[in-house]
């Protein structure tokens, strides 16, 4: 199977699974401003599950999905671009011919603030961004609304051809748009 180029735009909800369908879906890029849109092309919220490969020796891998032939980790260094204001984000970075050679790398999983982006904030109660912008619901601010754009090339194993492949993002702070090979897959 050809290599898979994965790009994601993360803005500022824990995302369960975004899956590709044959129908073409185009983002409006207004989803994150619309209180009525929680997801586009995302599985319904559900408990965690994982399908081990047939005849996989579950005792040998101790039911650890990361050791399964059906698991591909997205952990590692990704190309990364961070901006302070949402209107500064690159709007065409999902194109397969986009030049990200000037972008830095970022460890995934990773936290922006711990890795030098944004302002480190610890809040055990309340709202982490309190006082940073005018509270004007349902309006979402453009200024001081940090956006991270991620790019990575991965190889899908040849024996996955014809299988349903699900992208699982265990912890996205706010919104995510996902493209694969330059094609929009979903938003959550």
What is the predicted function of each stretch?
Residues 75-147:
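Core domains of carbohydrate- and sulfate-ester-processing enzymes
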Residues 1-24:
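Bacterial Sec-dependent N-terminal signal peptides
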Residues 23-39, 43, 48, 60, ...:
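Accessory beta-strand-rich segments of carbohydrate-active enzymes
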Residues 71-73, 160:
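Extracellular/periplasmic catalytic domains that process cell-envelope and extracellular macromolecules
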Residues 2, 21, 123, 129-131, ...:
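Generic cytosolic/nucleocytoplasmic N-terminal low-complexity/intrinsically disordered segments
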Residues 52-55:
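Activation corresponds to long, low-complexity, non-globular regions
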């Amino acid at each position: 199977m050809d290599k898979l180029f994965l790009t994601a735009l993360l803005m500022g909800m824990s995302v369960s699974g975004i899956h590709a369908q044959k129908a073409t879906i185009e983002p409006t890029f207004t989803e994150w401003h619309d209180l009525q849109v929680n997801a586009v092309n995302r599985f319904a919220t559900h408990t965690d599950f994982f399908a081990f490969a047939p005849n996989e020796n579950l005792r040998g891998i101790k039911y650890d999905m990361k050791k399964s032939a059906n698991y591909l980790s997205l952990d590692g260094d990704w190309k990364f671009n961070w901006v302070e204001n949402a209107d500064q984000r690159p709007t065409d970075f999902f194109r397969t011919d986009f030049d990200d050679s000037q972008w830095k790398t970022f460890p995934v999983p990773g936290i922006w603030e711990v890795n030098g982006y944004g302002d480190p904030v610890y809040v055990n109660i309340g709202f982490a961004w309190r006082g940073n912008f005018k509270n004007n619901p349902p309006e979402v601010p453009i200024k001081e609304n940090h956006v991270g754009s991620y790019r990575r090339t991965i190889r899908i194993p040849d024996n996955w051809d014809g299988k349903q492949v699900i992208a699982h993002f265990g912890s996205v702070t706010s919104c995510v748009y996902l493209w694969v090979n330059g094609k929009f897959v979903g938003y959550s």
